C-alpha cells in the first residue's frame, strides 16, 4: 500500500505541513472570520490637566502677534475665537496687539515688546503667538499656570519628518507633567514674564535704538534690541535664539511644556509627480482638513471641569 504523501509548501523561512495548512485555511475562511469577536477598543478617555483658576485670574497676559501683510491662517483665527470664549468664561484678563507690514521680524518683535512695556504696567506676561500657529485654549492656560519666567510649546518646522523648533540641553532641569528645561525655544508660541525684560536691560547686547518707524514717542524708552540676530560660536542665530542665549547668559532658564503640541501651518506645492507618494504617506487630504486633537479635559483646583471651546 502506497504511503500517503504529505502536502507541504515551502515558505521563505520554514516548511508548512498539511495539518498546518488546513488550520491556516480554516481560520482564514469567511465563516470563521465572521464569528470571531472583535477585540474591544480602549475608550479614548480625555487626558486630564489641572490648573489653578484663582491664580490665572491674577494674571494679565498681553498677546503679541506679528502679522506680515495683515494676514493670519485659519488655524490661528479659530484658535483665538476659542481662546476668547474660554478666557471670558474663566474671568481671565488679556489684551492683543498685532504688527502688520513689518518685514524685519526682529524689529517687529522689539516694537511689540515696547508696546507691551509702555501700554500698561499691570500686564504680567507677554505671549508671542505667530500668525501661522494653531493652538488650543488649554495650551495657554497650562503655560501661565507653570509660573516660570520663560516657557513655550512645541511646534514643528515646516518640513517632514517632524523636527521641533527647540534646542534641548544636556542634564536640563525636569519638572512634573512634561516640564523640560531647554537652551532655546521658538517665539512662535512663547510666554515671557514682564520682569524678564527688566533684567535683560543688564545684558551688553541689549541696546536702545532710535524710533524711526513712526511709533508713538511714549514708547521710545522701551525700544531696545531684546530680539536681534547674532553670531555665536561661528553660528548665525535668529532673533528668538539670540533672545534665549542672552537670557541664559544672565542665569535665566527656559522651559517647554511637552504636553503643548501645536500646529504650524505652511504651504505645499501639489503636483501629479508627488501624488503617489503623498497618497501612500498621508492619505487623501483636503487643504483645510481639520486636525484631530487628543482629547484633553481641563480641571480647576477643585477638580471641576473647565469648558474650553
Name these PLM-found stretches:
Residues 105-109, 240:
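Conserved donor sugar-nucleotide recognition element shared by glycan-biosynthetic enzymes
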Residues 136-228:
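Conserved catalytic core of nucleotide-sugar-dependent glycosyltransferases
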Residues 36-103:
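N-proximal low-complexity "stem/linker" segments adjacent to membrane-targeting elements
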Residues 2-13, 37:
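Arg/Lys-rich low-complexity patches in intrinsically disordered regions that function as generic
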Residues 111-125:
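Active-site nucleotide-sugar/metal-binding loop of Leloir-type enzymes
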Residues 56-58, 206-309:
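C-terminal catalytic/acceptor-binding lobe
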Residues 125, 149-150, 254:
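Short, Asp-centered acidic motifs that coordinate Mg2+ and/or phosphate
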Residues 122-134:
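Short beta-strand-to-loop acidic/aromatic patch adjacent to the donor-nucleotide binding site
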Amino acid at each position: 500500500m502506497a504511503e500517503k504523501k504529505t502536502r507541504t509548501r515551502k515558505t521563505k523561512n520554514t516548511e508548512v505541513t498539511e495539518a498546518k495548512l488546513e488550520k491556516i485555511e480554516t481560520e482564514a475562511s469567511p465563516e470563521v472570520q465572521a464569528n470571531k469577536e472583535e477585540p474591544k477598543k480602549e475608550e479614548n478617555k480625555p487626558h486630564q490637566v489641572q490648573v489653578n483658576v484663582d491664580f490665572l485670574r491674577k494674571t494679565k497676559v498681553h498677546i503679541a502677534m506679528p502679522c506680515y501683510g495683515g494676514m493670519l491662517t485659519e488655524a490661528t483665527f479659530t484658535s483665538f475665537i476659542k481662546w476668547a470664549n474660554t478666557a471670558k468664561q474663566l474671568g481671565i484678563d488679556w489684551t492683543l496687539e498685532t504688527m502688520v507690514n513689518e518685514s524685519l521680524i526682529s524689529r517687529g518683535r522689539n516694537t511689540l515688546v515696547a508696546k507691551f512695556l509702555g501700554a500698561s504696567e499691570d500686564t504680567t506676561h507677554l505671549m508671542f503667538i505667530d500668525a501661522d500657529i494653531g493652538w488650543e485654549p488649554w495650551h495657554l492656560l497650562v503655560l501661565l499656570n507653570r509660573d516660570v519666567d520663560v516657557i513655550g510649546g512645541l511646534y514643528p518646522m515646516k518640513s517632514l519628518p517632524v523636527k521641533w523648533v527647540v534646542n534641548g540641553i544636556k542634564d536640563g532641569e525636569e519638572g512634573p507633567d512634561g516640564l523640560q528645561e531647554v537652551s532655546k525655544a521658538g517665539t512662535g508660541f512663547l510666554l515671557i514674564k514682564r520682569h524678564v525684560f527688566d533684567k535683560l536691560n543688564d545684558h551688553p547686547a541689549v541696546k536702545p535704538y532710535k524710533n524711526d518707524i513712526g511709533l508713538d514717542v511714549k514708547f521710545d524708552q522701551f525700544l531696545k534690541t531684546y530680539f536681534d540676530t547674532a553670531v555665536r560660536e561661528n553660528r548665525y542665530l535668529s532673533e528668538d535664539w539670540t533672545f534665549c542665549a542672552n537670557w541664559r547668559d544672565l542665569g535665566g532658564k527656559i522651559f517647554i511644556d511637552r504636553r503643548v503640541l501645536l500646529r504650524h501651518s505652511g504651504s505645499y506645492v501639489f503636483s501629479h509627480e508627488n501624488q503617489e507618494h503623498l497618497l501612500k504617506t498621508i492619505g487623501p487630504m483636503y487643504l483645510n482638513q481639520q486636525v484631530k486633537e487628543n482629547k484633553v479635559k481641563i480641571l480647576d483646583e477643585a477638580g471641576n471641569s473647565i469648558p474650553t471651546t
